[in-house]
């Protein structure tokens, strides 16, 4: 059974999308494409893995950061994990509260991510923020948000290192 906070967060992002239209039309659904030899997927929130265990079209892969869901590139919106529903954004949990940022990893595949949050529907951004606030109230989900924050900080630091400057989310 999914944690209540996760059920509520998923519900908030069930219908709303980054653009008023299908953003996959902009890039050919680049975020849902897999490439031979690569096991790319989405990091699941605590409790989500059970939804996909044994489901056709989905593979669960353990990683040092948690469970990654790899799909075949097509699924119904109702079956998408929370990370897909909020893509290309990421929820961060800083000492001063919840923050919403463009996922540093998304910039490699998503033209909207390269544009930043201002290119997205502000209703979508607000819904992601509301979902993050719900998750931050749950200890297990808050710990996951802190891990996501650390991962984003590492990606930003690595990028800054190669650009020769210090950068923060």
Model-derived segments and spans:
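Short loop/turn segments that flank or connect secondary-structure elements
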Residues: 1-169
């Amino acid at each position: 059974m999914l944690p209540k906070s996760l059920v509520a967060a998923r519900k908030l992002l069930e219908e709303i999308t980054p653009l008023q239209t299908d953003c996959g039309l902009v890039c050919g659904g680049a975020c849902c494409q897999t490439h031979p030899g690569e096991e790319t997927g989405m990091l699941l929130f605590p409790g989500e893995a059970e939804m996909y265990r044994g489901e056709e079209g989905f593979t669960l892969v353990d990683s040092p950061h948690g469970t990654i869901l790899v799909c075949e590139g097509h699924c119904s919106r109702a079956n998408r994990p929370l990370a897909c529903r909020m893509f290309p954004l990421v929820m961060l949990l800083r000492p001063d509260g919840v923050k919403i940022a463009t996922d540093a990893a998304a910039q490699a595949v998503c033209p909207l991510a390269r544009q930043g949050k201002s290119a997205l529907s502000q209703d979508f951004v607000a819904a992601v923020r509301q979902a993050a606030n719900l998750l931050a109230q749950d200890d297990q989900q808050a710990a996951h948000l802190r891990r996501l924050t650390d991962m984003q900080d590492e990606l930003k630091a690595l990028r800054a290192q190669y650009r020769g400057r210090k950068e923060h989310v």
